[in-house]
Structure formats: structure tokens, C-alpha cells
Amino acid sequence: MERIKELRNLMSQSRTREILTKTTVDHMAIIKKYTSGRQEKNPSLRMKWMMAMKYPITADKRITEMVPERNEQGQTLWSKMSDAGSDRVMVSPLAVTWWNRNGPVTSTVHYPKVYKTYFDKVERLKHGTFGPVHFRNQVKIRRRVDINPGHADLSAKEAQDVIMEVVFPNEVGARILTSESQLTITKEKKEELQNCKISPLMVAYMLERELVRKTRFLPVAGGTSSMYIEVLHLTQGTCWEQMYTPGGEVRNDDVDQSLIIAARNIVRRAAVSADPLASLLEMCHSTQIGGTRMVDILRQNPTEEQAVDICKAAMGLRISSSFSFGGFTFKRTSGSSIKREEEVLTGNLQTLKIKVHEGYEEFTMVGKRATAILRKATRRLVQLIVSGRDEQSIAEAIIVAIVFSQEDCMIKAVRGDLNFVNRANQRLNPMHQLLRHFQKDAKVLFQNWGIEHIDNVMGMVGVLPDMTPSTEMSMRGIRVSKMGVDEYSSTERVVVSIDRFLRVRDQRGNVLLSPEEVSETQGTERLTITYSSSMMWEINGPESVLVNTYQWIIRNWETVKIQWSQNPTMLYNKMEFEPFQSLVPKAIRGQYSGFVRTLFQQMRDVLGTFDTTQMIKLLPFAAAPPKQSRMQFSSLTVNVRGSGMRILVRGNSPVFNYNKTTKRLTILGKDAGTLIEDPDESTSGVESAVLRGFLILGKEDRRYGPALSINELSNLAKGEKANVLIGQGDVVLVMKRKRDSSILTDSQTATKRIRMAIN
């Protein structure tokens, strides 16, 4: 205040004003400051005084031929003076106006293509809906957000190669376009931008916007997808928010959202299989999202979510060094600890072995709806400052922090036994046992925690055990703050390892992630997710399992048939039959399996009883561990559509229907593909015609390797011997004839020889 008074005083004296407005600036330091270097020191001032001059713009000499000296109003458009220090002319801003009105018009066809991101944004805003403005305190936390809607997910290097190839194809320099997306984009853009007159540099800038994800660390309350971020300045102020619904979708947000859903489904499914890590990798490699391979998306997409990070870790990619517990992302900001195993007793006198972190540490905790700062010592919570959207969210954060603190009074607050299991029916580790227990009911925990008197601190209030705010008292060490805690800003990625149970550890052995941390939230993906792996057939329910199992058999029929005759056990153990077992009533699975295996054995033994349709129909039932019994079945039950439906052993049923004339198979009324029976099956004759050009030598001889299918025989050299599988599921040894002349007689002798070889 004093300074301002003093200045006001000075200004009121006329001499002061005169000195300030009239004196020349000739102090060397000041001149140096404003004249050294190419960088403009005060651009807005420069612009203002330039525009006050008559001819502030310089232009190429050609302008004098294209623009008249004066406009209709007789104002001069350019000066005959040439610009000092260059051979350009001095031009008035009026010349620009004249040019815009009367200058030549070029083709505009490329503008929407080059400035695609802008045109798209206008469309989104045109179709977006702005709702009412609400005045309320905004809890904003800084998060790393995508500020560039509608981009592909190329790395900076990949994008650079694409841009050089599209915009400067003749420039020297090695450019390697390897990824599918790079090639597609390059081809597409080259076609779009043929004969484009827009300056190459501008095109390059715009392409970069389309190809690369740009992120900024911004204060956000509410939606974080790029479509919301582009209108951040319209939707949230310091004390107000405006509702907004985007118009249209952008691919990158859809990819992020669908990737999270696919990763969660895959991790949940892998966790219950016999070898979770192998299964997870198999699924990631065989899944497509919106037509792009999931593994390609994982390599490029920086989304940080528990399931996505587990998939990345499995692929050997680096991930963020923060760890996850109870759905919150923890980042240690100071301190350190060592781990030690300790046995503790719950309130129910159950013994738990927990890994205790000894030492003082500080963490930030960031969740979807709440954030916190946690300071803890060995098995003691020192301080927790929480902020969240509502009481429920604040309570969730408090429970997670208290469990994480490992305090004794938390463990003593357990009532009843802890026996939570994961999806694979394995017991959860003790920390997750405790977490689940209190997430179900935290009343005792909050009641026993203890309360304390609090000092009045700006922006902080106390919170009572029933989660109501108070200015006098609070749960011990816990306060609620109006300010959020910023997300961890670093984009640093670390090398991690993953074990077969999908637990991800950093190089010091700390567990960063595990399947228990994967959210159970179900959502609907915005892009089509295609899971080719049999493990994911269940995701769309029992019908999908049924159809997919039979389609898989038909697609792989040639190899299935050979395995069926040579190594049935290996065939029955194939993972593709695993999902099907959940459809067969548990009590009878074993009997069905024993029955079908016996039936198949007869097919192998008795000439002429081989039946393609029946074999395909019954094969999935043979996969369960068989129980030997004398039971015969005329139909087998599967649980679909909420009840048991029957598959007839001989003949068609609504579940499995094969039309001999059209060769089409329908499963539950849905077309499942074409099924080609072996040529002579209906007459149960011999495939002699197919064996023309081959001499049948006798029974199968294992020394000549696994049986070939009829189709594979054509690859044999003359005189070469091989085992071959003929129509009835029998295997015989054949030799390719050395001469073609005797082919005719083959058909007659084949029939006799096969009978002899088999019997």
C-alpha cells in the first residue's frame, strides 16, 4: 500500500509525468536488452507500433503486378520504397483486404483434408450439447490428459517417418515404415494430398496433430477423455462447472476405453486358467480391437490402468513405477522401508502372516473419485489428508489407507473369519483379505479407530466415524481437505517382471500389481473387440461357447481327424474344449465322456462305422476326465438358454442340426458353417478313387511318421512311403507309384488291400 501511495504522489507532480513521457531511452543496458538476439522481446508492443505505420508488411516484388497501386477508394496499397535490407516491397494492410476480396481463388479441396482436426472439432462442437452452469467448489486435480482428439497412436519417431514420407518423399534419409498403421496411414494420406498446394510445413504440422498423442498435466474435475479436455475452458472454472455432452466420438478415446475393457476381461479370464501368464499372452496375441491387433495397441498406447499394465508387463513392456492397492494408485513421495514377515492376530484370533513395511514413508493416493496424502510409520498411520467427490468416495479412500497402514487396531477390528477367494477359488493374500473384509463393512473399524480434538486449519475439516464432517473432532490422524491431490506427473517407465500368477514386481521385488487389483466394473466397449482365443468364448454366454466350439472343430477338421485316429488323448486335452465343460451338468460329465470315448473306439475298430457328423457332435463331450460305466445314452444334455437342452447321439436336434443335402450345420438355429463329409462315407465303401497312384502296402507303420490326410498325399515324391488316414478313420501304409501307367488297376486292388491291411 505504501509503495502505491508513493507512486501516486510522484505521478501527481507534473515534472514526473514529463520525464517519463519525454525522455529518450539511451541507456546502453536497455538498448542492449531490446536489440540483442533475434528473439522479439515484446511481440505485442511491436505488433501495435508496426500496424500504426502506413506500410508495416513486406511482400515479394511480384505483388506489384498482381495488386493495383490504389484500391477503389483511392487508398495506396503499396509503396514504391523497397524494404531496407531485402528486395521486397513495403505493403499496406489494405492490400491484404484487397487480395482477400479480389485475389485469385485456388482449389479448396485439400483444406478439409489437411485441417481435418479443426473441421472435426467444429463438427463435434456443433453437435455437442451444453447444459446448465452450476456454481460450486471445484475439486480439481492435475492429471495427465490427452489434449488432442482424433489422433492415431504412433510414437513420435514413427509419425516423423510417416510425415517425411508423405510431405517430403524425395528428401534423403532412411525411413523405415514397418508397422501396419504406418503403412496404412502413409498410403491414405499420399492419395488424399495429391496436388496439394498448401505449404508443406503446414501440412506436416497438421499431420503431426493427427498422428501423435499429445498429453499435458492439467487441473481437471470431471471427464478426462480428449473430447472433454478440448472444451475444458468452457466446462470448469474455479467455482463453476457447465455440463457438456460431446457430439460424436473420436477414435483415440474409443481405443482407450475398449482397450481397458478388453484387458480387464482377459486378465480376469487368465487368472482362473491353469497357467495364467501363458493364457494371458495367448489371449492378448489373438485379440483385435477395432480391427487392430491388441498387442500393437498395447505397444503404442500410454493408458495406465491396472489390467492394461498387467498385459503390458506380460509383453515385457515398461510400465509406471507406481503401485496399485484397493483401486488406488500409490506413489511414494519420500521415505523408505524394508519388508519383514510378521504374524498378527485378528479380532477373531485368526493368525495372519503379513509383510510389514518398516520405516517412515509418504505417499500420494489417486483414485477415480478420491485422492489423498498418506504419511505412515511402521504399522502406524501418522496422517491422512483426503479429498473426494462425496462421503462414499472419501470412506473408500480412508478404508484403503487404514488397511495399508497395517495398524494393530485395524487388524483387531476384524470380526468373523477371513476367507475371501479370487475368481480361481484361491485364497486372497492377507492384505487383500483385510481390504475385502472392511470394504464390506467398516463400521467396527471406524468406531475403534479413535477420535481426537482438532485445530482449525484453513481448507481442512475433521471427519467423524459416521463420515460426517466436523470442525471440533476427527478420526485420529485423518482430515478432509477441499483441495485434491495431483496425480503423479512423471511419465517415467520402469522395467518390471511378472510371475505366472500375473503378479507384477519392480526390480526391487515390490509388488506393483496383481489380478486382485483389476476392477470388476463391466462396461460396453465402443469398438468391436474380437477375441479369437477359445478362453474368451464364455464372455458372451453359453450359446457362444457352444457355437464357437463346433466352429473350431469344423475349421480344424483335417488335423482333428488325424489326431482323433492317432492320438485321441492329446485331442481330448485340447484347451479349446475347456469352456464347453461348463455347459455339461457336473454330475454326469464323467459318464458322458466315458460313453463317447468308447463309442469313438468302436468307430476306429469297426470298418464302415466312421461318421463325421456324429464325431463332430460328440467330440467336446469326450474332453472331461472319463468315468468307466456300462451306461449308454441316446441323448446328451447341455445347459444353454437357462435350461438343459438335448443333443441326440444319433440324429438331429434343435441344438445340433446337420442338413445332408446343403452340407450346412446349424447350432441352436444359427448357421455354423459347411461340413464336408468324407466322400464315400455314406456308402461306407473305400476311398480307393482318392488313392489312385498309390500302392497300399499294409497296416500302419509308425516308422513313417504321423498319418497324413488324403490332401497331404500329393506332396509325396515317387516311391516315397507314408501312413495315410482313409475315410473310416483307419490308417494304412502306402507308397506313391513310380510309374503312372498302372494307375487304373489301383482302384480295383485298393479295396482288397485295404480290407486286408485293416483286418
UniProtKB/Swiss-Prot annotation:
Coiled-coil region: none
Motif (Nuclear localization signal): 736-739
Compartmental location: Virion; Host nucleus; Host mitochondrion
Gene Ontology biological process terms from the UniProt entry: 7-methylguanosine mRNA capping; cap snatching; DNA-templated transcription; symbiont-mediated suppression of host cytoplasmic pattern recognition receptor signaling pathway via inhibition of MAVS activity; symbiont-mediated suppression of host gene expression; symbiont-mediated suppression of host mRNA transcription via inhibition of RNA polymerase II activity; viral RNA genome replication
Keywords: Cap snatching, Eukaryotic host gene expression shutoff by virus, Eukaryotic host transcription shutoff by virus, Host gene expression shutoff by virus, Host mitochondrion, Host nucleus, Host-virus interaction, Inhibition of host innate immune response by virus, Inhibition of host MAVS by virus, Inhibition of host RLR pathway by virus, Inhibition of host RNA polymerase II by virus, mRNA capping, mRNA processing, Viral immunoevasion, Viral transcription, Virion
Annotated positions for site Mammalian adaptation: K627
Annotated GO CC locations: host cell mitochondrion; host cell nucleus; virion component
Gene Ontology MF terms: RNA binding; RNA-directed RNA polymerase activity
InterPro entries in the cross-refs: Flu_PB2_2nd, Flu_PB2_6th, Flu_PB2_C, Flu_PB2_CAP-bd, Flu_PB2_middle, Flu_PB2_N, INV_PB2, PB2_helical
Function, as annotated: Plays an essential role in transcription initiation and cap-stealing mechanism, in which cellular capped pre-mRNAs are used to generate primers for viral transcription. Recognizes and binds the 7-methylguanosine-containing cap of the target pre-RNA which is subsequently cleaved after 10-13 nucleotides by the viral protein PA. Plays a role in the initiation of the viral genome replication and modulates the activity of the ribonucleoprotein (RNP) complex.
SUBUNIT field: Influenza RNA polymerase is composed of three subunits: PB1, PB2 and PA. Interacts (via N-terminus) with PB1 (via C-terminus). Interacts with nucleoprotein NP (via N-terminus). Interacts (via N-terminus) with host MAVS (via N-terminus); this interaction inhibits host innate immune response.
Family: Belongs to the influenza viruses PB2 family.
Listed name of the protein: Polymerase basic protein 2
Organism classification: Viruses, Riboviria, Orthornavirae, Negarnaviricota, Polyploviricotina
